[in-house]
Structures are given as structure tokens and as C-alpha cells.
Amino acid sequence: MYSMITFDHIHLAFDGRKILNDLSFEVKRGEKVVVLAKSGSGKSSLFSLILGFLEPDEGRVFFDGRLVDEKSVWEIRKKIAYIDQDISLGNGKIPDLLDFVLKLKTNIHLDGSRKQLQELLQYFEFDEEVVKKDIESLSGGERQRLAIIIAVLLQRDVFLLDEVTSALDKQLKKKVADFFIAREDWTCLVISHDPVWLENPAVKIFKLEEGKWKP
């Protein structure tokens, strides 16, 4: 397996406070990695650095072998799905949003895409009544699951997941975690304290303290 995400001696500070301190690590293709850290410890900054929303004070970030910089960042973002606990999906009707997403998939037969959509809706427990809702009326957990469905339809294979199971019940938490972990070719970097991730033997756990990894 080769590296999909690499942090090379990253230093990052805000208002004089060190957030990341000479941090180096890699996430290989297909790995599922969970980051454990206290609030305000810089874990969300990891995602911002990968997506190019932040630049490190020192060091380099690579995605799929490419340096993350202003020249590469737009192409890199097209390959990544970022889903957080407060995901915004805009306004309007769910069917309209899903139709729009399906039309973006120009390289796959539409009938096959619609079949995949129905399978995803069923797996993530979206019944017909929920699908008819306005987007703004969805609960936090429904928005999280819908964002996952959209990311899968758009064929992302690198997922940055920030507390993505936080608003779900125990059964759905497990279904979401199992869904990602079962996809051997998907690379996932996850921020979570949820046991459904931490207790799975297929998941690698990194603990971030004082800007560095701790054993």
C-alpha cells in the first residue's frame, strides 16, 4: 500500500499557541485511521491542512504523492469527501439534490446510479417519508447520513470524517462504521471517540497530545 496522506514535520500555531509540533505521519491507501484528541488540540486542523484551507508554518503535506499547495489544491479537493457533525447541504428538496448529484455522474449509466442510490437509501434507513422532506428539516443524523450517500455517489475514495456518527443511535453508528471499514480501497481519516470505530480491529488509532502523537 502506498501513502495517500502524508504529514512531513508539520508545525502549526495560532496566536502564539503551538497546535501541531513537528508532526509526521502517513495514512496509506485503504487504511482506516481514527484520531483521538481533546477539544482544541488541533485535530480539526489536520483536515484543514489536507484540504488546503490552512498552510503549515513549517513542513509539508502530501496527498496521493502531490504536495498540497495553491497549484494542486483544487484537483485534490475533488478526490476527497469531508463530512462533519454539522454538515450543511443547503436548502430545497432532497429528491432535487439527489437528482443533481446523479447528473454529475456522467461516466456511469444513469440506471445503475439510480439503483445504487436506492440501495444506499435503504442501507442508511431513509424511508419514503424522509426522502420527501425539505433538506432544512432534516435532523443532524439524517444530514450526516445523506452527506455520506452523496459522497459515495460522487465516487470519492478518500473520506475525512469529523464526528460523523455523533448524532446517530447505536444501531446506525455501527452501520455507518461497518460501511466504511468494509470498503478495502477507501481511505478514511476519522475524528471520533465512538466505540464503534475504536473497538474495531481493522482501525488504526492515533492519539494527539500537545501537537504530537502519543503511544
What are these regions (language model features)?
Residues 152-153:
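ABC ATPase C-loop
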Residues 59-68, 76:
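Conserved ABC transporter NBD signature motif
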Residues 5-7, 20-22:
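Conserved structural motif at the start of ABC-family nucleotide-binding domains
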Residues 134, 163-164:
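Walker B catalytic motif
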Residues 148:
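Hydrophobic anchor residue at the start of the ABC signature
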Residues 51:
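Helix-to-loop junction immediately C-terminal to a conserved catalytic motif
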Residues 134-138, 142:
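Conserved ABC ATPase signature
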Residues 92-109:
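Q-loop/switch helix immediately C-terminal to the Walker
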